[in-house]
């Protein structure tokens, strides 16, 4: 098991390393399996790294070998979203982290930085590490994205973690963890980050 997520209806989504997705329905108590089968509406990857849910009940699925997938539980169909680099002909497949917040999907990639997808317009913005800019993300390897109770958004990277500043549309790297690999984060009941 590589990732696990409980949706708002109580269903359990299990992401595996090379075996796709298993879903345990809370209503039927049966297991559904999803894996790439080469058709247009199937899952695009086998290495499942993260899940998140949007307000419409759709499940966003990050894979390390097939990019970003949107699963519609009503139709049981997948839609693949390739992240684009500066060259629109090159898609990127290795995604590690997801967060849905106010109509925007935050996407943490391996080696290509942070993408923010406006789910209404389809527009995407890419944030990359820039050595000349201390307010850029600290590293292009994003492993986790976390939103605290107060609405702050943090990124865990290969070189520490940072907090997003929405007013300046920039990031503040948090010391003394600026050179530590941050794989995951959680906020405790006191508002402290671990």
Where are these regions (language model features)?
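Carboxylate-rich, polar loop motifs that coordinate divalent cations or form catalytic acidic clusters
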Residues: 1-194
């Amino acid at each position: 098991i590589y990732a696990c997520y409980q949706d708002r209806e109580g269903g359990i989504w299990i992401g595996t390393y090379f075996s796709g997705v298993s879903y345990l329905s809370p209503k039927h108590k049966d297991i559904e399996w999803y894996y790439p089968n080469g058709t247009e509406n199937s899952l695009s990857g086998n290495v499942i790294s993260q899940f998140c849910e949007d307000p419409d009940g759709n499940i966003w699925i990050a894979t390390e070998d097939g990019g970003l997938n949107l699963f519609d539980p009503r139709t049981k169909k997948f839609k693949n979203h390739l992240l684009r680099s500066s060259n629109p002909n090159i898609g990127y497949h290795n995604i590690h982290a997801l967060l849905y917040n106010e109509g925007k999907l935050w996407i943490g990639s391996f080696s290509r930085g942070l993408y923010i997808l406006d789910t209404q317009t389809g527009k995407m913005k890419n944030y990359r590490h820039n050595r000349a800019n201390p307010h850029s993300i600290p590293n292009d390897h994003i492993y986790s994205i976390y939103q605290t109770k107060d609405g702050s958004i943090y990124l865990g990277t290969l070189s520490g973690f940072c907090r997003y500043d929405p007013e300046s549309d920039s990031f503040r790297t948090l010391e003394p963890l600026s050179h530590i690999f941050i794989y995951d984060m959680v906020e405790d009941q006191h508002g402290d980050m671990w």
